[in-house]
């Protein structure tokens, strides 16, 4: 499906043909990607799906340091990963990037993705001849099709699952969402610096447990870890980057609600970011689960 950006007026006067080369990309929309991923899971086809969202794409252009402090090591690792994936089979290693126009994201636009900064980064660092996918396609807080989210959860619950995620995630929440899971814990603060030890631990656990699916919610450690595991495990297990979708359920577990500009600690250890209120998203999903 070919997507083009119009005259730029919808982007605050920015010209997509100059700043965002996405008008010429071959893209798969959220619905298309979801169909591919769900079918892969149903048919036990091994694949990986990683999301290069506003975090890493903004970070490499020094525009986004709220999740990690500025560090050339992180920036260079991301750029190296971007180049590596160009050589991977595009059906085996699917790459999701921000594409939050209504046609790509089921009629809804993400309130958080910094799409302009992301596309400037893409133009510099990603192979624009590669096939890309709308990055909200798995189950997303932003594209709040909660029934689709439950469909994804049900598919995953039928598998043997490992979650590589925040050390603060309560196992009760993980088991509620994804079934009886194994949790490889990731540091809450500056997770990137632990990506090599995380990779080694996942390999160890995979050899011992032979998981069907490994889910990643590991902040900046997700990207280098998934790339490394794809190579070291020789594409032998399905890996899916689920972003921060677990977070609203953790907030609900601890009875945390929206705190705009609140005194919260981010993954960089800094204070002052905010937690968005996804109360309705969580409530709707919990109701569907309870009614099943």
Identify the function of each model-found stretch.
Residues 102, 188-190, 246:
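Residue-level detector of flexible, active-site-proximal loop/helix-junction positions
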Residues 114-115, 161-212:
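Conserved nucleotide-cofactor-binding alpha/beta core module
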Residues 32-35, 77-84, 196-206, 222-223:
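A short, acidic, amphipathic alpha-helical segment used as a generic capping/interface helix at domain edges
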Residues 213-217:
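Short catalytic-loop micro-motif centered on adjacent basic/acidic residues
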Residues 221-292:
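C-terminal functional extensions of proteins
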Residues 1-177:
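Electropositive, gly/pro-rich neighborhoods at or near active sites that engage anionic ligands
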Residues 99, 185-187, 243:
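Residues at the C-termini of beta-strands that transition into short coil/loop
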Residues 55, 101, 219-221, 245:
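Short glycine-rich anion-binding loops that position phosphate/pyrophosphate groups of nucleotides
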């Amino acid at each position: 499906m070919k997507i083009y950006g119009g005259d730029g007026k919808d982007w605050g006067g920015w010209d997509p043909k100059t700043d965002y080369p996405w008008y010429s990309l071959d893209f798969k929309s959220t619905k298309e990607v979801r169909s591919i991923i769900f079918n892969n899971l149903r048919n036990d086809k091994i694949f990986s799906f990683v999301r290069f969202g506003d975090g890493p794409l903004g970070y490499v252009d020094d525009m986004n340091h709220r999740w990690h402090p500025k560090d050339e090591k992180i920036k260079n690792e991301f750029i190296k990963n971007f180049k590596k994936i160009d050589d991977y089979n595009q059906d085996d290693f699917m790459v999701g990037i921000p594409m939050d126009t209504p046609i790509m994201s089921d009629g809804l636009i993400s309130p958080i993705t910094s799409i302009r900064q992301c596309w400037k980064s893409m133009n510099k660092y990603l192979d624009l001849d590669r096939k890309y996918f709308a990055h909200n396609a798995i189950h997303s807080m932003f594209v709040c099709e909660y029934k689709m989210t439950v469909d994804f959860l049900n598919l995953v619950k039928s598998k043997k699952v490992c979650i590589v995620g925040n050390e603060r995630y309560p196992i009760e929440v993980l088991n509620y969402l994804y079934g009886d899971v194994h949790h490889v814990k990731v540091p809450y603060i500056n997770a990137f610096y632990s990506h090599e030890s995380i990779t080694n631990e996942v390999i160890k656990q995979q050899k011992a447990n032979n998981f069907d699916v490994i889910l990643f919610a590991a902040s900046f450690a997700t990207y280098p870890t998934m790339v490394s595991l794809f190579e070291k495990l020789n594409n032998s297990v399905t890996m899916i980057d689920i972003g921060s979708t677990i977070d609203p359920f953790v907030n609900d577990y601890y009875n945390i609600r929206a705190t705009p500009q609140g005194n919260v600690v981010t993954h960089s250890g800094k204070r002052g970011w905010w937690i968005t209120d996804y109360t309705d998203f969580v409530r709707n999903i919990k109701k569907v689960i309870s009614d099943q």
